[in-house]
Regions:
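Short N-terminal "domain-start" leader segments
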Residues: 1-30, 34, 71, 77-82
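Compositionally biased amphipathic helical and low-complexity segments enriched in hydrophobic
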Residues: 3, 13, 25, 40-43, ...
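N-terminal processing/targeting junctions
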Residues: 18, 48, 53, 63-66, ...
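A short, exposed loop/beta-hairpin motif centered on an aromatic-Gly-Thr core
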Residues: 29-54, 60
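Residue-level detector of alpha-helical recognition elements and their boundaries
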Residues: 53, 68, 72-75
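Short arginine-rich
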Residues: 58-71
Length: 82
């Protein structure tokens, strides 16, 4: 399984398995810098599959210019020298 955690300032964003509205699913969450608790991002619905949720997180990260904080199970290509 592939998993990426993104960072924006002191906040981390990742896909977590959580119960939201009495439904267990994959949810895009934000880690609170004060409590260190993973909280569901408001307005984002739970996904049935992990790949769906990761794809949505990648789109959000690209649109908001978040940087990669951690990556598991993904090989990133080394930057090319120009």
């Amino acid at each position: 399984m592939q998993s990426v955690t993104y960072r924006r300032r002191d906040y981390l964003f990742a896909v977590r398995r959580k119960v939201v509205d009495d439904q267990l699913g994959w949810t895009i969450c934000m880690r609170s810098p004060r409590t260190h608790e993973w909280l569901p991002v408001l307005g984002e619905r739970p996904f049935a599959g992990h790949a769906e949720a990761e794809a949505r997180l990648v789109r959000l990260a690209k649109d908001n210019k978040w940087e990669v904080a951690y990556a598991y199970g993904i090989d990133f290509a080394s930057p090319e020298n120009k």
